[in-house]
Amino acid sequence: VSAEISSTMDIYATAHDIAGIDLPNDRELDSINLMPILTGGKGDRETYFYYRGYRLMAIRHGSWKMHFMTQNAYGQPQPVTHEVPLLFNLDVDPSESQNLAEKHPEIIEKLTAIAKEHADSAEPAPSQLETRIMAN
């Protein structure tokens, strides 16, 4: 078990490393190499952004996870936008059951600034959920 931040998209960079293949450098990649984590070391990711389609739903930074919006599942009622984001310390509350937003406004402020910086620099890609490839 590891508390390091990782994602299934990291399999891409990890597989390249295992195979001895260089990653493409003609585009920005979100994948990171997990080999340091898999061999008992620290990971390279400190922050992770949770999207649903084009919507930034949440951000994780270190032990903290903050939800701007929540939604149960695709096809369910529209997401709930939280005027004050929900905040959880995943080190002590991995089930995200104790909202700490009122106790830690400084963390809300810090993560909001990180999310804004990310949003200002991110270039949206076409949605794979809204685009269908027609069979020939």
Regions inferred by a protein language model and the residue ranges of each:
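A general alpha-helix detector
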Residues: 14, 96-99
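Cytochrome P450 catalytic domain signature, combining two hallmark sequence patches
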Residues: 44, 108-109
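Intrinsically disordered, low-complexity polar regions and short flexible loop motifs
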Residues: 93
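Short amphipathic alpha-helical coiled-coil/interface segments
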Residues: 104, 111-115
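Active-site-proximal N-terminal segment of extracellular/periplasmic enzymes that hydrolyze or transfer
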Residues: 98-106
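Basic/polar N-terminal segments that are highly enriched at the extreme N-terminus
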Residues: 39, 133-136
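Short, flexible loop/turn segments with low-complexity composition
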Residues: 123-134
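C-terminal cap/loop subdomain of S1 sulfatases and analogous C-terminal strand-loop tails that border
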Residues: 1-86, 90, 121, 125
